[in-house]
Each structure stands twice: as structure tokens, then as C-alpha cells.
Curated annotation (Swiss-Prot):
Residues 182-214 have a biased composition (Acidic residues). This is CLK4-associating serine/arginine rich protein. Belongs to the splicing factor SR family. The keyword DNA damage does not apply. The lineage of its organism: Eukaryota, Metazoa, Chordata, Craniata, Vertebrata. Residues 340-353, 378-395, 487-510, 518-527, 636-645 have a biased composition (Low complexity). Probably interacts with CLK4. The modification Phosphothreonine is found at T327, T567. The gene is Clasrp. GO terms for cellular component: nucleoplasm. Probably functions as an alternative splicing regulator. May regulate the mRNA splicing of genes such as CLK1. May act by regulating members of the CLK kinase family. Residues 290-313, 436-446, 584-611, 619-635 have a biased composition (Basic and acidic residues). Phosphorylated in vitro by CLK4.
């Protein structure tokens, strides 16, 4: 079967090759015989017999039927021909009053150019009418001379150069008739064409190359053309136009051949290179569907300060106009420079730092945002209170500033707290706060105070809280833990509240803690304490500043930069990769299950074969036992004491049966 397929394939391949070669030969043949369509029209006149029968021809050509036309005996005509009555043809005299329009005149000049172009060239080259007719006769008789193409000429020239010998018979001497001309009217193009020809008579269809003519030859050509109804300068101008048209046709033909050469599925790269080469010099304008920036406008009428502070772009990259200024901690210890920097940051954000907040409405958002604290941390909390007990969940994301080293950390904390409040209200507040720390250090404890505001008036109360942040990977570079007590005011209350916290922190900047607190006057809460929390107000003691400077780089080494946000293309790529992994795992699992199933089926078939072989052996053994019992009963009936010969036969048959039963073929 395979050999037949190979034979059929070889046959098809041979047919394809034959068709391709035949198409190439056909194309070459048509390329050889292809000519200019203007040269297809030919008028032939020759003597021929009208009547094939000789008797009828003689009768038709007898003087009875033939008569001279216009008295010329050399020109005989049939007397039944209608042209016999045209004995007088008057000369045509155009009317003097009829004027020809410029369009008609130009058309007539073009027609004269097409009619008498060959005659003008012959007059310019000094070729007589007999020579021209003889050349036409030679062309019709022998089918024209195939002039070698330019590629063949180049190949022949390369061969001549490689051999180092000039063939004298490759060119023919110039025509004697041209050499005997009294005036040097022959153009260089005509000389080259004459030298290339193998015949004595040059090719009549070769046109004059206009670019190689000098001014005298151009004037002579135009003068020769005026006798044939053309205006002065028409002939050379139309010759140049014809040459440009021929060049354009040649260029278009070359393009078509190049396109045909690049046809097919495997030539996409060549077609692309050809298209790029053609469009290389052009300037391409951007398409109409290119992306344009959307217009930005304010849909509502707002005050300028409110619209500028609250309208934000949705783009993730910050615009250069609203880029916030980054302030760095340069010193610790309550210097005037820090206060000036804080004041400048507050002024740049566009809000007064000491502006009192407006009283909140019940169940509405709390207005008034401190813009100077907005850059440090943002927290949103929603609290619901029913019958003096409220459960609130707040999720806060605090983004700390940059240190000098360029490292930053993001700390996310979620805290669930239950608080007990004296007043029943339902409030939802969003706050952005800024922590300021001051105070001294007392045997490892750090005290910090931060002014804060809350969405409603809450009586001053003292709370103690302990927070722990666990570190999964503890490093012993700075000691495993340190205790700090801090007195802080909650960031959104009008009346300050103090909280003392003992924090245990490691070297991890992102910590999550869950806390539940139930307090009337005291509350215990677990709150996240990031190790690299930046405090903008300077501490009272420089020892705390030194300790911060030492602990901050150690924490920054472990955290590293925040994870960049993925673009939609990267997310789609990641999703596709996950889907491919899942599909690969599923395919692998299916293949393993299929292999296990095949192994199980093979094991079952082997078990069935073993069971069948065991049954066959048991049946064979039972049959042999029955035969032996029958033989024993039969011989015991014949004689109780068997003869020695029988005993030998019996013992030998018994041995044979035992050897068969113990043969390895039946052993299991």
C-alpha cells in the first residue's frame, strides 16, 4: 500500500513539474512573439488568380472582358467593375471659408504623425523607398531577425572579457550607402543600430533616440516632418512623448513581473519588503482612527477651589500639573526648619492647617478634609450604632512618605472593632489623618501625641491598648522586640483622647491584625504598627531620631519596593498562562488515567487467560484420571495377578502419563 502511494505521489509530482515546464515554455514563446500592437496592422498586395479554373481565367482576362482604365493600356480593369465608370477624378479643393478648430487641427497633426512617422525617419536616415520595401520583404520572408536581448549581450560581453579576446565577426561594418551620404545626418542611435545588424539594410522599425540628437539633427527632423502636414517641432515632441510612454510601460511591466515573482503563500516577506521599498520615500499621515485625547470639562458649576481640589483624573499616572510635592525628614528634635516645611506643605495643598471641622450630620459624610494629612494616611470607617452598642468595620490603607534612601513601604491594615458609645447615632465618616509625634524616650518607651478629629463630639476618655504585630521571618539584627508606650489622640475627635500602647514589632512592613475591642471607659485593641511609619513632627529627644534612623534601613531591606500594578495586557497574559497550565494539568491527568485504565484492562485480560489455562489444565487432569481408573478397573477384572509383560507396559504407561502431567506446558 505504501509503495502504491509513493508511486502515485511520484506520478503527480512528475505531472506538476511537466505542467510547470510547459507553462514556462509557453510564456517564453509568447514573450518572443509579443510585439507592439501598433505593428500588428499590415497591408499586403500581391498578384493572384481570381478564378482557379484556367479556362475561366483566360476568358476573364480576354480583351472582350478587360478594358484599359482611363486609356492606360498598362492598367487593365474588368468592364463589369464599377470603377470603370470613374474615368475622371477631379482634384479636391477645400473651401476657403470653412475654418478648422484647434482641437481638430491638433488631432490632424497627431494623425499625420502616426501616418508618416516611418517616412520621416527614412528621409532623415537617407533610406530610399526601394530599400525600405526590400527590408519589409526580407522581414516577411524570414520572420524578422531576432536581435539578442540586453541580458544576452551582457553575458556575451562577460565571456569575451573572461577569455580576453575580441571577436571581430561580432559586429558588421557600417552600411556603404550610409557612408556615401554627403551630409552627416545619421544619428548616433542609428549608427549603433546599423552596426548591430547582421544585414546590409538596417532595421526600419528602429526609432530615433531623441535624447542623443543634437540641435541641428532636431531641427532637421522637424523640417522633414513639416512636408508631411506636421507643425514645426511636433515630430520631436511626439517622439519624446512616445519614448516616455514606452518607459512607463516598461516600468509597469517590470513591476508586474516582480509581483508575479512574489506571488504565493511563501513570498509574504518579499511582498512586504517590496511594498516597504515602494513606500520608503513617502510621508504617511496618521490614520483618521488614531487615538485622540478626550476633551476635559467640568460638568457642574463649582467654586474654583472646590473644583480644583476635588476633580481628579482617572489615569493612574500623575499629571505634571497636580503632582504632589514630596517632603523628606531631614532632622529631628523640634527645629524651626521642620515647622516651616510643614507649613509650606500645608500651604501647597491648598487648605488651612488650623481650620476647625464642621459639625457632622447624622447619617451623612463628615465634611472638611485636612489636605496636609491627606498625603500620609487615608482611612475609611463605617460605624453603626443600635441601642448604645455599635459595630464598626474600618479598612485603612496608609501610604508612608519616602525616605532619603528612596525606599517606601505600604502598610495595609484591617481592623474590626466593637465599641460602646454613650450617644446613639449612625455616622459614616471618611478621614485622612496625619500623625505627629513628639515626646521623650524613657527606658525604651516611646511617647507620641497626634492631634486628631472625629466625626462627632466624644467625651474625653483614657484608653489603654496593646498591639502586637507578628513577624514570620524574624531577624536578629536589631534585637527581636522592643517596647514602646505612646500617648496618642485619635485622629478624628475634637476632644483629645490618650492611649498608651506597648508595641512589639519585627522587621516586616506589611502586617495585618484583627482586633475586637469592647470598651466603655477602657478598650483593648490589636492595631497594626508598621515598623517604617513616618512621623512628620520631630521627636523631643534626638535619641529617638537616631533610633529611627537605625531601624528604618533594616526594615527597608526586607520589604523592597511595592509590587507594580499589572497592565491589562499583562493580566490577560497571566490569565492565559494560568488557563494553559490548568489545561496542561488536565491533559496530563487524563493521559495518566488512560494509561492506568489500559494497564488495568491488560491485567484483566491476563487474568482471564490464566483462568482459562487453569480450567483447561484441570479438565485435562480429570480426563487423565478417569482414563487411568478405567484402565485399572479393566485390568483388575482380567487378572488379579498381571503378567510381567503387562506389569511392564502398565508401569511404562503410568510413567508416560505422569511425565505428561508434569510437563512444563501444563505446569502453572
Amino acid at each position: 500500500m505504501w509503495h502504491e502511494a509513493r508511486k502515485h505521489e511520484r506520478k503527480l509530482r512528475g505531472m506538476m513539474v511537466d505542467y510547470k515546464k510547459r507553462a514556462e515554455r509557453r510564456r517564453e514563446y509568447y514573450e518572443k512573439i509579443k510585439k507592439d500592437p501598433a505593428q500588428f496592422l499590415q497591408v499586403h498586395g500581391r498578384a493572384c488568380k481570381v478564378h482557379l479554373d484556367s479556362a475561366v481565367a483566360l476568358a476573364a482576362e480576354s480583351p472582350v472582358n478587360m478594358m484599359p482604365w482611363q486609356g492606360d493600356t498598362n492598367n487593365m480593369i474588368d468592364r463589369f467593375d464599377v470603377r470603370a465608370h470613374l474615368d475622371h477624378i477631379p482634384d479636391y479643393t477645400p473651401p476657403l471659408l470653412t475654418t478648422i478648430s484647434p482641437e481638430q487641427e491638433s488631432d490632424e497633426r497627431k494623425c499625420n504623425y502616426e501616418r508618416y512617422r516611418g517616412l520621416v525617419q527614412n528621409d532623415f536616415a537617407g533610406i530610399s523607398e526601394e530599400q525600405c520595401l526590400y527590408q519589409i520583404y526580407i522581414d516577411e520572408l524570414y520572420g524578422g531577425l531576432q536581435r539578442p536581448s540586453e541580458d544576452e549581450k551582457k553575458k556575451l560581453a562577460e565571456k569575451k572579457a573572461s577569455i580576453g579576446y575580441t571577436y571581430e565577426d561580432s559586429t558588421v561594418a557600417e552600411v556603404e550607402k550610409v557612408a556615401e551620404k554627403p551630409e552627416e545626418e545619421e544619428s548616433p542611435a542609428e549608427e549603433e543600430s546599423n552596426s548591430d545588424e547582421d544585414e546590409v539594410i538596417p532595421d526600419i522599425d528602429v526609432e530615433v533616440d531623441v535624447d542623443e540628437l543634437n540641435q541641428e539633427q532636431v531641427a532637421d527632423l522637424n523640417k522633414q516632418a513639416t512636408t508631411y502636414g506636421m507643425a514645426d517641432g511636433d515630430f520631436v515632441r511626439m517622439l519624446r512623448k512616445d519614448k516616455e510612454e514606452a518607459e512607463a510601460i516598461k516600468h509597469a511591466k517590470a513591476l508586474e513581473e516582480e509581483k508575479a515573482m512574489y506571488s504565493g503563500r511563501r513570498s509574504r516577506r518579499q511582498r512586504r519588503e517590496f511594498r516597504e521599498k515602494r513606500l520608503r520615500g513617502r510621508k504617511i499621515s496618521p490614520p483618521s482612527y488614531a487615538r485622540r485625547d478626550s476633551p476635559t470639562y467640568d460638568p457642574y458649576k463649582r467654586s474654583p477651589s472646590e473644583s480644583s481640589s476635588e476633580s481628579r483624573s482617572r489615569s493612574r499616572s500623575p499629571s505634571p500639573g497636580r503632582e504632589e510635592k514630596i517632603t523628606f525628614i531631614t532632622s529631628f528634635g523640634g527645629s524651626d526648619e521642620e515647622a516651616a516645611a510643614a507649613a509650606a506643605a500645608a500651604a501647597a495643598s491648598g487648605a488651612a492647617p488650623g481650620k476647625p471641622p464642621a459639625p457632622p450630620q447624622t447619617g451623612g459624610p463628615a465634611p472638611g478634609r485636612n489636605a496636609s494629612t491627606r498625603r500620609r494616611s487615608s482611612s475609611s470607617s463605617a460605624s453603626r450604632t443600635s441601642s448604645s452598642r455599635s459595630s464598626s468595620r474600618s479598612s485603612s490603607r496608609s501610604r508612608r512618605g519616602y525616605y532619603r534612601s528612596g525606599r517606601h513601604a505600604r502598610s495595609r491594615s484591617r481592623s474590626w472593632s466593637r465599641s460602646r458609645s454613650r450617644s446613639r447615632r449612625y455616622s459614616r465618616s471618611r478621614s485622612r489623618g496625619r500623625r505627629h509625634s513628639d515626646g521623650g524616650s524613657r527606658d525604651g518607651h516611646r511617647y507620641s501625641r497626634s492631634p486628631a478629629r472625629r466625626g462627632g463630639y466624644v467625651p474625653r476618655r483614657r484608653s489603654r491598648s496593646r498591639s502586637r504585630s507578628g513577624d514570620r521571618y524574624k531577624r536578629g539584627a536589631r534585637g527581636p522586640r522592643h517596647h514602646s508606650s505612646s500617648h496618642s489622640r485619635s485622629s478624628w475627635s475634637l476632644s483629645p483622647s490618650r492611649s498608651r500602647s506597648v508595641t512589639r514589632s519585627g522587621s516586616r512592613s506589611q502586617s495585618r491584625s484583627r482586633s475586637r475591642s469592647q470598651s466603655h471607659s477602657q478598650s483593648q485593641s490589636h492595631s497594626p504598627s508598621p515598623p517604617r511609619e513616618k512621623l512628620t513632627r520631630p521627636a523631643a529627644s534626638p535619641a529617638v531620631g537616631e533610633k529611627l534612623k537605625k531601624t528604618e534601613p533594616a526594615a527597608g531591606k526586607e520589604t523592597g519596593a511595592a509590587k507594580p500594578k499589572l497592565t491589562p495586557q499583562e493580566r490577560l497574559k497571566l490569565r492565559m498562562q494560568k488557563a494553559l497550565n490548568r489545561q496542561f494539568k488536565a491533559d496530563k491527568k487524563a493521559a495518566q488515567e488512560k494509561m492506568i485504565q489500559q494497564e488495568h484492562e491488560r491485567q484483566e485480560r491476563e487474568d482471564e487467560l490464566r483462568a482459562m489455562a487453569r480450567k483447561i489444565r484441570m479438565k485435562e487432569r480429570e480426563r487423565r484420571e478417569k482414563e487411568r481408573e478405567e484402565w485399572e478397573r479393566q485390568y483388575s477384572r482380567q487378572s488379579r495377578s498381571p503378567s510381567p509383560r503387562y506389569s511392564r507396559e502398565y508401569s511404562s504407561s503410568r510413567r508416560r502419563s505422569r511425565s505428561r502431567s508434569r510437563s512444563p506446558h501444563y505446569r502453572h
